[in-house]
Amino acid sequence: MVAFTIEQIRGLMDKVTNVRNMSVIAHVDHGKSTLSDSLVQKAGIISAAKAGDARFMDTRKDEQERGITIKSTAISLYASMTDEDVKDIKQKTDGNSFLVNLIDSPGHVDFSSEVTAALRVTDGALVVVDTVEGVCVQTETVLRQALGERIKPVVVINKVDRALLELQTTKEDLYQTFARTVESVNVIISTYCDPVLGDVQVYPQKGTVAFASGLHGWAFTVRQFANKYSKKFGVDKEKMMERLWGDSYFNPKTKKWTNKDKDADGKPLERAFNMFILDPIFRLFAAIMNFKKDEIPVLLEKLEIQLKGDEKDLEGKALLKVVMRKFLPAADALLEMIVLHLPSPVTAQAYRAETLYEGPSDDPFCTAIRNCDPNADLMLYVSKMVPTSDKGRFYAFGRVFAGTVKSGQKVRIQGPNYQVGKKEDLFLKSIQRTVLMMGRSVEQIDDCPAGNIIGLVGIDQFLLKSGTITTNEAAHNMKVMKFSVSPVVQVAVEVKNANDLPKLVEGLKRLSKSDPCVLTYMSESGEHIVAGTGELHLEICLQDLENDHAGVPLRISPPVVSYRETVEGESSMVALSKSPNKHNRIYVKAQPIDEEVSLDIENGVINPRDDFKARARILADKHGWDVVDARKIWCFGPDGNGPNLVVDQTKAVQYLNEIKDSVVAAFQWATKEGPIFGENCRSVRVNILDVTLHADAIHRGGGQIIPTMRRVTYASMLLAEPAIQEPVFLVEIQCPENAIGGIYSVLNKKRGQVISEEQRPGTPLFTVKAYLPVNESFGFTGELRQATGGQAFPQLIFDHWQVMSGDVTDENSKPGAIVKEKRVRAGLKPEVPEYTEYYDKL
């Protein structure tokens, strides 16, 4: 246990080469928080007796009740290494003391935006995988997010005690299970890896994989055992590490190593990993769990484990815990792996700078980030807001990438829409205090140098969710985070007592601050809408809203799904609209955009801010567009970055550039509220074929062009086989074989389609993957548990948009009914308008 003073931590923060910023990421229920606990216990912030059941990182009451992590929390740990260990570190270091900033993030898929926020401020990730369940859908999603942010992973295979006690596996089976898990992690890494990172695959023999049991509090890496044996036998540690994994066998008779699994006489040999590493562990388990009183002391003596007075009387699992903790303490193995294999901010910012910074990669700010320079101008990224203990105020939680942040410093607070030289989304304010985040508590410090994680007090009113803080007006923003989920489920919220309305409005503001991926807005009919990524996420958000942020009783509508409007064919004729003064005409046609192009736009591969030539290159080479069209994209919509495009196909039109701004504004408006039922449009390409304009500038102002362009966009869409797209979840369900029938019946009832079903090798579990429309997903978990007797656990994650088949104008079809209901709710006429409403004859 280390007694910490804030001064000591502050001293460590200056040695940036000895700082490690890392997050713990994994599938839900694979044991992140439990592992984090054993690390925290080592750093002396939680008492040794409580670790394992304290779940220190889960700071909220609902987290402790549900047993899941909802928000990501941060904590600083202290690790000291021996000189031998420090020699093995492949990057520059300074002394033996290390500061590890650990962020425990949620595994449940509805909260993956929290994970994104945590990843942005860290350089390394501890990926936790369950031995028995293996790599799941969420493991893959989170790992993909991490690699996209250029974050280096190391792996912990957790819950080894389950394999030993529940499944009673043999040594070779266990080795094969480990090998399979490592392989499936490496497949994901090599698929999504950024070449700049180099080879970041994980190898047990290099010490980048640890094997652990979070509940029992023990863990080991191959390197630790190699250390023990190299001292005992006097062999080289590096060589020993190579031999303790993979196909290498030790022949005890000849005392020679071989890579064949039989000796000269054809007797089978035991794999080195099994013999030198698993054997002592298996023997301890067997002796203790079978209560062999005489064997235990002999084994303990061999392994040099000493029990204290009252520990000698323990037996069974309690004794096992104590012994394993002494034999292989979890914190030692994990801290050693973190310090040895994860990059320091100095190392990491060198290759992460260009993915973090929006401006040119050779300006002084990007250079300062690349060098992690504490004396440069301040560059700090706030990735999220953390509510303080007194209601209503927030800490801004972020990381200093360059410069030093001080209490009382005057800074520029730049929101996500800020552009250099403009005034919007910019505040000049001073930071009241800088604080260290320590799980449940905060500690005040005076300043914080580059490379460290920090909380700021007093700027929460000026930032919505995330943003950049600088001291120089020439600095660009840090890039906005890309979330892998989108809010597709929404509810309307109203107060039970009309006097409470102001509290609700204030509460909604706070809610959208405290969660990076919730949307709150007011609809045209005056309802307050809250949108979330899924049922659980919404439930938690509304619970927060009612209890904390607004603090008043609420009435909540049934959940509604957001749809997208699209077209399925080309307009059957050219649409034409005239301006209100009849002097200007616009002729356009609409056509669908390929799904791949839409996805590229949504994932930021094709970006409205890119150079138009580079963008045209991608569209022409990858998606087969005509180069001339690809260069003449006027804008993306809605919000300037959505998956709908205006393409200028006119020939020799006078004054065309003067109306470009008006056309763009009108298109943003038209795609934000489409013609079918006022939802966002998706995958619609509008080609402007011809424009006739009045010669006199005063007769072709915005007031003439904007309504015309909007009407003609609507007309062209209604002529092009209008349709609606619904969001679809990818469901992954793990269950025993006898529950599969129940799963299929529930999925069929809910318009789900199964895409794969496979058995996990070495376990009785099956993994079923299916697509399930979000519209049908409400109450899905409950029905599934009923149908399978509680044996199936679904994971829902937003996957794609899918066109609903059927005519939107026919109210007896499925999409027609949805459209009609939505139009009535929004107070529009129940019928979808005819194109003639927007189309003008010559």
Curated annotation (Swiss-Prot):
A Pfam family annotated for this UniProt entry: EFG_IV
Keywords of the record: Cytoplasm, Elongation factor, GTP-binding, Hydrolase, Nucleotide-binding, Protein biosynthesis
Subcellular location as annotated: Cytoplasm
Binding-site residues for GTP, renumbered to this chain: 26-33, 158-161, 213-215
Catalytic activity, EC: 3.6.5.-
Catalytic activity: GTP + H2O = GDP + phosphate + H(+)
Name of this protein: Elongation factor 2
Organism this protein belongs to: Candida albicans (strain SC5314 / ATCC MYA-2876) (Yeast)
Gene label: EFT2
